[in-house]
């Protein structure tokens, strides 16, 4: 049964934060279940979110909620074990809207690190705004 793999021990990093204002637009806001807070990247292409889980996980689904006009157009998912180089898992193409979107991952390998790369954005300046990010799957016990 798939469950959220994001927990207090999950470490996250992002490519940038708008104006370095982490108090208002920091990465933690993707995981706080508050529909009024968000991570807002600075401008530039290839923005990303990197997650490191406390143990190996089998990812079955990625859920993202963008702000319309600031969505990823072409995205890729990469993953690896803790000390390995990231490997390509999947390309996906979100719609430019405010809805929670779901991207199933068929035959996902066991990973401990997961990177979502927003290769380009619907925003002219390349900014990405994410209100919700959740990773579903199973923990490798």
Curated annotation (Swiss-Prot):
InterPro entries, alphabetized: Galactose-bd-like_sf
Cellular compartments per GO CC: nucleus
Top-rank taxon, per record: Eukaryota
Keywords of this entry: Nucleus
SUPFAM superfamilies linked: Galactose-binding domain-like
Subcellular location: Nucleus
Main location per the UniProt record: nucleus
Described purpose of this protein according to its UniProt entry: May act as a repressor of nr2c2-mediated transactivation by suppressing the binding between nr2c2 and its response element in target genes.
Family statement drawn from the similarity comment of this UniProt entry: Belongs to the NR2C2AP family.
Protein name (record): Nuclear receptor 2C2-associated protein
